[in-house]
Design a protein with these regions (language model features):
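Intrinsically disordered, low-complexity regions enriched for glutamine and histidine
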Residues: 1-2, 296
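Catalytic cores of DNA base-excision repair glycosylases
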Residues: 2-164, 170-183, 196, 246, ...
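Intrinsically disordered, low-complexity, charged terminal extensions of DNA damage-control enzymes
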Residues: 152-308
Length: 308
């Protein structure tokens, strides 16, 4: 949950999640809809899907017990090398280095590593250097302290902007500080290009207050979540409406929802109908008191709430 999300936002979600799924077995046996429903509002929903798949793998392949080495952990869905190393080090005391964003910054500056980390080979080279920095005399019980200290150093002292070098215990040996290159390191030139998409969103609701929602495909925007049906154009939306209903449709003010590397321009089209009807097998109608249990994307939830 803490990946890409601030602690203050996560706390409430974390507590509710553990209340509902107190162990691996209960999470593994839950439906994806239940998991996504509790995740709704946090964003980055692939984290929830991967966590669910990971629990299923641990329950099925490891009898409900997490593997304890970084190598084994990387075989689980959603766990990459750095996350695996962090779990192995912090939870099971394995002598292994991690390389999350904070640690990359600390190690790059400390050693003056000036290769572009956009290249896989260069990141591997930095990882080897991080391995070489592991304490020789470190006991197993000390590994969680070492790992957490490096992450905290990057998060609070060796920050991306305006690092607090005078507070850093490594200042006297730091190559970047000595060469006045702190602001230049680490180097990563390749960035994902921002894109934008426009979608017309059908907000169809009955007189009784039921709203049409569609289960999104397992790939793409809001994969696996329930959302309002979306179309590439107003014309495509109108084509699915019952005969004569398009004249009752009301277009309301469009808005932009910002994803990590994509801007969604959403154009809501509101239509009140006397009774429910279907445009596809993936569509269902839900009353307002059912929304809380669904995995609804944040903009969909806000739009529905704003319309009462």
């Amino acid at each position: 949950m803490l990946q890409q999300t601030q602690v203050a936002t996560v706390i409430d979600y974390f507590e509710k999640f553990l209340d509902r799924f107190p162990n691996v077995q209960q999470l593994a046996q839950a439906s994806q809809d239940d998991v996504l429903g509790l995740w709704s509002g946090l964003g980055y929903y692939s984290r929830a899907r991967n966590l669910h798949r990971c629990a299923q793998a641990v329950f099925a392949d490891y009898h409900g017990y997490f593997p304890q080495t970084a190598l084994e952990l990387t075989s689980l869905p959603g766990i990459g090398p750095s996350t695996a190393a962090a779990i192995a080090s912090l939870c099971f005391n394995e002598r292994v280095s991690i390389l999350d964003g904070n640690v990359k910054r600390v190690v790059s500056r400390y050693l003056g590593f000036d290769r572009d980390l956009s290249a896989v080979a260069n990141e591997r080279a930095l990882w080897s250097l991080a391995d070489s920095l592991l304490p020789d005399q470190c006991s197993a019980a000390d590994m969680p302290v070492y790992t957490q200290a490096l992450m905290d150093l990057g998060a609070t002292v060796c920050t991306r902007n305006q690092p607090k070098c005078n507070d850093c215990p490594f200042q006297s040996d730091c190559v970047a500080f000595a060469s006045h290159k702190t602001a230049l390191l680490p180097i990563k030139t390749r960035k994902l290009k921002r894109t934008s998409e426009s979608h017309w969103v059908l907000v169809a609701h009955t007189v009784a207050g039921e709203v049409m929602l569609e289960k999104r495909p397992q790939k793409g925007i809001w994969a696996g979540l329930y959302a309002l049906p979306m179309f590439d154009s107003y014309g495509a939306l109108v084509q699915v409406l019952p005969a004569g209903q398009h004249v009752k449709a009301q277009t309301i003010c469009p808005f932009v929802h910002v994803l990590t590397h994509k801007d969604l321009h959403l154009h809501p089209v509101v239509l009140q109908t006397p009774s429910s009807w279907a445009i596809a097998e993936s569509v269902k109608w839900f009353a307002a008191d059912q929304w809380a249990a669904l995995g609804l994307p944040q903009p969909v939830r806000k739009l529905l709430q704003s319309l009462g």
